[in-house]
Structure formats: C-alpha cells, structure tokens
Amino acid sequence: EVKYDPCFGHKIDRINHVSNLGCPSLRDPRPNAPSTSA
C-alpha cells in the first residue's frame, strides 16, 4: 500500500507513513525517508 504525504506529496510506504504524526522532516536520516523516491 502506498500513500501520499499531504505535506510534500511524496510516495511513502505505510511502514514509513508518518504523515499522521505531522509533516516529516526533509532531513529525515532514515534511508526510506519520504523525501526520497524509492
């Protein structure tokens, strides 16, 4: 399942779906950060 982050519109996996916690940081250190198009 793929969702779109309401703040940036990037595709993110439900595992990394943090949009429900607020806007994820573009400097997110995680390799699967929403700021990256994997």
Swiss-Prot record:
Query: Which GO BP annotation is one of this protein's?
Result: vasodilation
Q: What is this protein called?
A: Natriuretic peptide DNP
Region listing for Disordered, in residue ranges? 19-38
Task: State the protein's purpose.
Answer: Exhibits vasodilator, natriuretic and diuretic properties in animal models and human tissues. Acts by stimulating cGMP via the natriuretic peptide receptor 1 (NPR1). Is a poor agonist of the atrial natriuretic peptide receptor 2 (NPR2). Is not degraded by neutral endopeptidase (NEP/MME). Binds to atrial natriuretic peptide clearance receptor (NPR-C/NPR3), which may be responsible of the removal of DNP from the circulation. Increases calcium uptake and induces histamine release from rat peritoneal mast cells.
**Places the protein is found:** Secreted
**What InterPro entries would the database entry show?**
Natr_peptide, Natr_peptide_CS
Q: List S-S links within the chain.
A: 7-23
- Which species? Dendroaspis angusticeps
Where expressed (tissue)? Expressed by the venom gland.
Q: Which family does it belong to?
A: Belongs to the natriuretic peptide family.
User: What are the GO MF terms of this UniProt record?
Assistant: hormone activity; potassium channel regulator activity; toxin activity
Q: Where do the coiled-coil regions begin and end?
A: none
GO cellular component terms, alphabetically, are:
extracellular region
Which residue ranges run through the membrane?
Answer: none
Keywords of the record: Calcium-activated potassium channel impairing toxin, Disulfide bond, Hypotensive agent, Ion channel impairing toxin, Pharmaceutical, Potassium channel impairing toxin, Secreted, Toxin, Vasoactive, Vasodilator
